[in-house]
Swiss-Prot record:
Signal peptide positions on this chain: 1-19
Underlying gene: aurF
Record-level Gene Ontology MF annotations: flavin adenine dinucleotide binding; N,N-dimethylaniline monooxygenase activity; NADP binding
Residue positions with a glycan: 59
Keywords carried by this UniProt record: FAD, Flavoprotein, Glycoprotein, Monooxygenase, NADP, Oxidoreductase, Secreted, Signal
Pathway: Pigment biosynthesis
Protein's cellular compartments: Secreted; Secreted, Extracellular space
Protein name in UniProt: Monooxygenase aurF
Subunit structure: Might be part of an extracellular enzyme complex composed of GIP1, aurF, aurO and aurS.
Function according to Swiss-Prot or TrEMBL: Monooxygenase; part of the gene cluster that mediates the biosynthesis of aurofusarin, a red mycelium pigment which is acting as a mycotoxin. The first step is performed by the polyketide synthase which condenses one acetyl-CoA and 6 malonyl-CoA units to form the first intermediate, the cyclic heptaketide and yellow pigment YWA1. The C2 hydroxyl group in the pyrone ring of YWA1 is probably formed during ring closure by an aldol-type cyclization reaction. The dehydratase aurZ then acts as the first tailoring enzyme in the aurofusarin biosynthetic pathway by converting YWA1 to nor-rubrofusarin.
PANTHER family, sorted: DIMETHYLANILINE MONOOXYGENASE (PTHR23023)
Pfam family membership, one: FMO-like
Length: 527
């Protein structure tokens, strides 16, 4: 019997790791991408494409931000520039022999499930065959992420504005706005990056935002800010999150709040406070924003309310500003209707989401564990609708391992009623968060999701690093390495150390030891 065929739509970081993990488990998987390269948004390109800017820098360190079985090169800086991540993804594809299974310059137009054939019919085209044609696959993974369609809030009077108006998706060359007065809309990582990129060359940058933000630097006391996580701390925090979520939230907000205020002298007029809770939104990571605000090259304003005339805008507090350009750094949304209305995970989502205070325009799809279609859990998955305080490459490596394992052995799926209940509970939690303010709809309860994925992929970590017979045996047999696993920097490679359902990586042990030795030599012992 031939291996099941799988189409993976998108060959950025999400698609590549999914392709690798599915092929590793014996699936006849291919990746499809309209571009002539792999790497997705990490491959810089001019024009109206969603890509990084040339100056983009990773928000997480190389030690924490890699895939589970493929470290960044040793000579990489601790925070990787966009060009380095693009190269890393291409090296990943070559190392695991993925390129021969990548169909580039292939545009995806839609998919429909055929009940008779029990297969998915995909509509595809290429430059050589521009007319869409059909191809059949047993399973489909959408790995295009949640950032697909630019989101632009309606601004009263915008048609009167005679200056430059652009969404961050297509803005790649800050030099075009040199000497201009620019208003940047938004208060996330993209808005902060755009504003600080423009600050040295623009006449004035206004950063317009409606709410506060948690801002953290990349470096604290000479160490990468994410070099605090150990497995022991992870277990303790997960227990708090599960059994005393209110205390966990209060503790995390307090710890991060102290870090922020010990690092930066935040002025009230910058309006970082009140910041959203860490449960609602991930921190903004930027090293240049505060210095630019201090110098006055960036001025923090209230949110843009309306355009008055060809160059005059008014913010929600009634202040008026003369500007030459407006940049929308207001995020993206996603359209899942490409799988047909019968399978669109957003078609029957709760209307309470759109009514909530924290609704940001993004949909809230009904996906089991934020991955699997409830209509076709054994054949349709979405990689990218997932967010919590963990590095993205690591999270989606785990998520795609879960897809591979559950599609390999579907008996691991709970009943349809149980899957629906999990989604109902997840949505109720997200909507409750949205009562406090803006919330990322892809956010999940970290402790519950990690416990689930540990079990599904068979990582072996809870058994070998817990108070079990396997745990005691591991400690007695390999005490030094056990101690590194428990109290050294928690590495993504830990999830490939022990044998289990997913494939272990023989190099995981050496990689963890080498990484911790290098980290200690350069930064000292773990705090």
């Amino acid at each position: 019997m031939p291996n099941p065929t799988v189409a993976i739509v998108g060959l950025g970081a999400l698609g590549l790791v999914t392709l690798k993990n599915l092929r590793e488990e014996g699936f006849d998987a291919v990746g499809l991408d309209r571009n002539d390269y792999v790497g997705g948004l990490w491959h810089f390109e001019e024009g109206n494409k969603l890509t990084v800017m040339r100056s983009t820098l990773s928000n997480g360190s190389k030690q924490r931000g890699c895939f589970t079985d493929f470290p960044f090169p040793e000579d990489s800086p601790d925070f990787i520039p966009a060009e380095g991540i693009d190269r890393y993804l291409k090296d990943y594809a070559k190392h695991f022999g993925l390129l021969e299974h990548c169909r580039l310059r292939t545009s995806f137009h839609g998919a429909r499930y055929d009940e008779k054939k029990q297969q998915w019919r995909l509509s595809l085209s290429t430059p050589d065959a521009p007319e869409p044609h059909f191809e059949w696959f047993d399973k489909v993974v959408f790995a295009m992420g949640a950032d697909q369609i630019p989101s632009r809030p309606k601004i009263e009077g915008i048609e009167k504005f005679k200056g430059h108006v652009e969404h961050s998706m297509s803005f790649k060359n800050p030099e075009t706005l040199a000497g201009k007065r620019v208003m940047v809309l938004g208060f996330g990582n993209t808005a902060a990056d755009m504003a600080t990129e423009l600050a040295p060359i623009a006449d004035q940058v206004y950063l317009a935002h409606r709410h506060g933000a948690i801002i953290v630097p990349r470096w604290v006391k000479g160490k990468p800010v994410d070099h605090v996580r150990t497995y022991r701390k992870y277990v303790i925090l997960n227990l708090m999150n599960r059994y005393t979520p209110g205390l966990w939230e209060k503790t995390m907000n307090s710890v991060i709040g102290k870090l922020v205020h010990n690092t930066f002298d935040l002025k009230p007029e910058w309006r970082f406070d009140p910041a959203p809770s860490i449960t609602n939104q991930r921190p903004l990571v930027n090293d240049e924003l505060i210095p630019s605000l201090e110098k006055g090259s960036i001025i923090s304003t209230h949110g843009l309310a309306r355009v008055i005339d060809e160059n005059t805008v008014e913010t929600s507090d009634g202040q008026r500003y003369e500007v030459d350009a407006i940049l929308f750094c207001t995020g993206f949304t996603v359209d899942y209707s490409v799988v047909g209305m019968d399978a669109d995970p957003c078609r029957a989502t709760t209307t309470d989401w759109q009514k909530s205070r924290g609704f940001t325009g993004r949909p809230l799809p009904r996906l089991y564990q934020n991955i699997f279609s409830l209509d076709h859990p054994e054949t349709l998955a979405f990689i990218g609708h997932l967010s919590f305080m963990n590095p993205a490459f690591f999270m989606f490596d785990l998520a795609s391992m879960a897809v591979a394992q559950l599609w390999k052995d579907p008996s691991g799926f709970p009943s349809k009623a149980e899957m629906n209940k999990q989604v109902d509970d997840q949505h109720a939690w997200v909507i409750d968060l949205a009562k406090k303010g803006p919330v990322t709809p892809s956010i999940v309860k970290a402790s519950e999701w990690m416990e689930w994925v540990d079990r599904v992929i068979g990582s072996g970590l809870p058994e070998h690093l817990g108070y079990t017979m396997k745990g005691w045996n591991f400690w007695m047999r390999d005490r030094k390495f056990c101690n590194i696993m428990m109290d050294g920097l928690l590495s993504p490679h830990a999830y490939r150390v022990f044998p289990g359902k997913r494939k272990a990586w023989p190099g995981a042990r050496d990689a963890i030891i080498a990484m911790n030795a290098d980290r200690e030599a350069r930064f000292g012992p773990m705090d």
